[in-house]
């Protein structure tokens, strides 16, 4: 009887240790995931912020505010949409690459989850900031999920 109680309590202790280890790994994975998404988002923001140095905005318009962007949208040419597209694509690619590199399990799922989160942010921007339909289709179709998949593939190749 005593031996059964000792074995049972040892089993419970081992079970608690495994659960703690699993919870610790889950929290660490969540932290790494959030940091990677934020890193991709910051890279996106940096590219957008400094894009006017590469492609000057239309004359007389301030693209640093939402109102300025809305006002300039009717006079913007396709060249003005290159940098926002690249910012979205590179930010997503970087976030998915980093997630794949640093998280040990379910890499593809997590990389695509990064792409999906960025895709949701892109959908939000489509509703908030009216832009040409061709840009919305290109951006939503190519800058998020495909770039997350590419980030995953590059990280797998890089880590070999």
Regions found by a protein language model. Name each.
Residues 21-160:
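Juxtamembrane/disordered regions of integral membrane proteins
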């Amino acid at each position: 009887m005593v031996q059964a109680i000792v074995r049972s309590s040892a089993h419970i202790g081992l079970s608690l240790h495994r659960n703690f280890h699993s919870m610790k790994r889950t929290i660490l994975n969540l932290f790494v995931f959030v940091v990677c998404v934020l890193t991709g988002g910051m890279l996106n923001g940096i590219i957008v912020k400094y894009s006017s140095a590469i492609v000057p905005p239309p004359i007389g318009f301030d693209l640093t505010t939402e109102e300025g962007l809305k006002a300039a949208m009717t006079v913007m040419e396709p060249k003005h949409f290159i940098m926002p597209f690249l910012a979205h694509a590179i930010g997503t690619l970087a976030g998915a690459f980093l997630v794949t590199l640093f998280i040990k399990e379910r890499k593809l799922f997590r990389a695509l989850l990064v792409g999906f989160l960025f895709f949701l942010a892109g959908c939000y921007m489509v509703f908030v900031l009216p832009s040409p339909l061709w840009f919305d289709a290109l951006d939503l179709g190519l800058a998020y999920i495909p770039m997350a998949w590419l980030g995953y593939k590059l990280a797998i190749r890089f880590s070999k």
